[in-house]
UniProtKB/Swiss-Prot annotation:
Produced in the eyestalk X-organ sinus gland complex of male and female lobsters. GO terms for molecular function: neuropeptide hormone activity. The modification Alanine amide is found at residue 109. Disulfide bonds join 41-78, 58-74, 61-87. This is Gonad-inhibiting hormone. Keywords: Amidation, Disulfide bond, Hormone, Neuropeptide, Secreted, Signal.
Amino acid sequence: MVTRVGSGFSVQRVWLLLVIVVVLCGSVTQQASAWFTNDECPGVMGNRDLYEKVAWVCNDCANIFRNNDVGVMCKKDCFHTMDFLWCVYATERHGEIDQFRKWVSILRAGRK
């Protein structure tokens, strides 16, 4: 009889551990997707690849000038700033300006 109680107790521990793992995994997933939902760009959900391409310009610009504030200002208002255009030229991607404008308009879709 003691072995049953002992084995029942270990089964409870296993279930408890399983529940904790599932809850923690769900929490991590929500935090990862929150980065995109809390962003200033309403069209980023479903367009993460576009967001990454446009954000890459800002990251490169911040690296060129060794100043994180440049990258932050570039991404402000969902890339709809003169700082973003300045970074496009600073990273010598001015030939792609029309493509970047299309991508930014997609990312800004639904914005009030």
